[in-house]
C-alpha cells in the first residue's frame, strides 16, 4: 500500500520520516511505500526536539486553543496534496497528524456520503482527539456510533499524556475493524525491536483487513 504520512505538531515530514524509520524499514519489505506531507502553518519546534533537529517546523492547524477555521484549511491543504501526489491507499499520522487524518475521514464521510472513503486504512500513533470541521469542538465518542468505518490501527503509549485522547480516538472507530496496541511508553514511536515488530504486526493486520474489504 501507499501511505500518506502526517507528522505531529511542531515537527515536519522529515522528522516523522526519522520517527517511523524502524517500522517503515520492515513495512517496506512487504512493498509498502510512504509519502510525507508538511503542515501548512509555521510553528515553534516541539520542546523536546529544540536544538536537536533543523526546521522549519509546522502545525497542521492551530494548537493550544480552538483551531477554528484552520481545521478546514488543513483539510483543503491535505486534499490538495492528495490530488497532486496521490492516490494513497492508507494514511499514517502521529499526534496532531493522527487527529487530522481522523477528522478528515469523518468530515469526508459526512459531506460526501456516497463516495468511497479517502483511504482504505488508517494508522493512528499517539493520536489526539479530532476536531469538528468548525474547529470549535472536538469529536467525542458516542454510544454505538462509529464515524470511522475503515480498518484502523490505534497505537498508543500508556505513559503518554495524550493516552486518554488516543483511547477516545480508538472509540470513534468501527470496533470490528479497529486494532489497539499499547507500546507502554511516552509520546513517541518506540524504536526497540519488540515494540517495532508488534506495531508492524498490527499495521499489517489492518492492511489485510482493508484488502479483504
Locate the predicted segments by residue.
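Serine-hydrolase catalytic machinery in alpha/beta-hydrolase-like enzymes
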Residues: 1-87
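Short beta-strand/loop motif that positions the catalytic acidic residue
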Residues: 147-148, 153-156
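Post-His helix in hydrolase/transferase enzymes
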Residues: 191-205
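A conserved short beta-strand
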Residues: 113-128
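Acidic catalytic loop of the alpha/beta-hydrolase fold
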Residues: 130-131, 156-164, 186-188
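Gly/Ala-rich beta-loop-alpha elbow adjacent to hydrolase catalytic centers
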Residues: 92-101
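Catalytic histidine neighborhood in serine/cysteine hydrolases
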Residues: 173-190
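Conserved alpha/beta-hydrolase "acid-adjacent" motif
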Residues: 14-15, 161-167
